[in-house]
Amino acid sequence: MSPVSVISLPSDLCLPTSFIDRSGRELIPLHITIPNVAMRRQGKLMTRASMSMNLRTAVSDDAVIRRRGDFHSNLWDDDFIQSLSAPYGEPSYRERAERLIGEVKNSFNSMSNEDSESITPLDDLIQRLWMVDSVERLGIDRHFKKEIKSALDHVYSYWSEKGIGCGRESVVTDLNSTALGLRTLRLHGYDVSAEVLNHFKNQSGQFACTLKQTEDQIRTVLNLYRASLIAFPGEKVMDEAETFSAKYLKDALQKVPVSSLSREIGDVLEYGWHTYLPRLEARNYIDVFGQDTGNSQSYMKTEKLLELAKLEFNIFHALQKRELEYLVRWWKGSGSPQMTFCRHRHVEYYTLASCIAFEPQHSGFRLGFAKACHIITVLDDMYDTFGTLDELELFTSAIKRWDPSATECLPEYMKGVYMIVYNTVNEMSQEADKAQGRDTLNYCRQAWEEYIDAYMQEAKWIASGEVPTFEEYYENGKVSSGHRVSALQPILTTDIPFPEHVLKEVDIPSKLNDLASAILRLRGDTRCYQADRARGEEASCISCYMKDNPGTTEEDALNHINAMISDVIKGLNWELLKPNSSVPISAKKHAFDISRAFHYGYKYRDGYSVASIETKSLVKRTVIDPVTL
């Protein structure tokens, strides 16, 4: 417990306005310096003189004792970001990548022209699946959308209720191609049933393999495990496949020598699918793919795939540097460094965004996500620890007025918080308006107001020491998790159209939004409840469950929450991938992947409060360090 520090905002703030070149070739940050101005009001500049503080209505900071979180400081200062080199932004690298893209497209097309006498139908299907799987895991699939669809349409034409066999009329099926086909086809929205896996059980109803663990057999079980992770609700056979294959692979790791295969197995077991962020997977798979001779296809130019993957990784690295430089200027210009009561994780949030969306044209999404999450973190620390209940009630009312003059009743430190919320939400709405061709501000404001209301409810519980029922806490906690406000404006800045009927399937009242919010609340609480309780925050999913179920232990509660998380993940999979949906996967993918990004942040611990271990490693591996060509 430490006394409050009164924080004064600088009189001159540099307000960033971004112009994102959707071609991806340029990112031009524009800074407008406005003397004695710290705010905008729907296009009107608001001077500090026009919002002078009314001392009679302000909450006094004198002698207020405040709680503070024990958080480490920002790990990535401006000097470090500026010192990063980005040699792969030169045009010659882009030109080389474009040539390789053409050659890889030729490799895809050549699969349709193979001599039918020189390759069996099964080998042909495996090669097509391998090619699609490889470009996706290497992070270069965005260049081959047409070729991927053609390959998968061909594979799907051979799909039967027993999976994939040696031909359309064959009664002999193959587990490797069936498992890889089930996973890949399902991820692209094809209607494929997991029941095909029942045909690979023995008479006892168990999955079985020979005792001798050959490399081919290990790879088959690895593909079975990867397929089992794309499970939908109620698919018992997928649970059985996951249990069997996970045990088999863990046993194999103890026996096979250290190799690209053992590393691949280790990575898949470590991250699964829901926390294996695409750019992290690409970074890891580049290393594995470069050493992997046993999984190469004779007629495919695997070295070209690898070279292209490395070039694309590093070319994006150059764009990341420019975006980071802009983000740091925004962070400094917003007055954030003076907010010493909260965590500063803008670089970490940008990293998560760039791990799930590394298309060059989606700069607005990446930067918008980082900004929104920074605001969420500031508000989280203010409502949970630093602010008094009276101050928070005033702030909540001020947000609903959406007018800088509302800050007259706020203490000085809250003025800065209010204005970063106000300015940033308005600026992101302007970007969304341009992308969507309609006004989005009022809709997005409503989302932020509901989010603030949920925080206010939690602040009241903290102040009173009340532990609500699990249902009451859980429903409020899904809103206060921040998933909706972290996703809404960033996805609206993309080049994907979101008419009202599509937005309803991604935002409220969609099941996708509800489940994504649920996993953030549930997983976050399992990682944070002990630290929160030490700071006086009694209510959590764990404590509320124990209150509702007298006699249960923390272990019982955690087991229950973890089972809920498993079910939520399956529900999320279904909402994203359900066949014949009126909303394309592409419209839902960013919101879905945001849930994966947050889930990764809580995989080992609260990676947002303690960002100096796994989260720091993620930043270095996917943003700071290029790969060696």
Swiss-Prot record:
Requisite cofactors: Mg(2+); Mn(2+)
Reactions that this protein is recorded to catalyse: (2E)-geranyl diphosphate = (1S,5S)-alpha-pinene + diphosphate; (2E)-geranyl diphosphate = (1S,5S)-beta-pinene + diphosphate
EC number, UniProt record: 4.2.3.119, 4.2.3.120
Biochemical pathway: Terpene metabolism; oleoresin biosynthesis; Secondary metabolite biosynthesis; terpenoid biosynthesis
Cellular localization per UniProt: Plastid, Chloroplast
GO cellular component: chloroplast
Residue sites binding Mg(2+) 3 per the record: 532
Pfam family for this entry, one: Terpene_synth
UniProt GO MF annotations: magnesium ion binding; pinene synthase activity; terpene synthase activity
Family designation: Belongs to the terpene synthase family. Tpsd subfamily.
Its job: Monoterpene synthase (TPS) involved in the biosynthesis of monoterpene natural products included in conifer oleoresin secretions and volatile emissions; these compounds contribute to biotic and abiotic stress defense against herbivores and pathogens. Catalyzes the conversion of (2E)-geranyl diphosphate (GPP) to (-)-alpha-pinene and, to a lower extent, to (-)-beta-pinene.
Name this protein carries in UniProt: (-)-alpha pinene synthase 1, chloroplastic
Organism the protein comes from: Pinus banksiana
Encoding gene per record: TPS-(-)Apin1
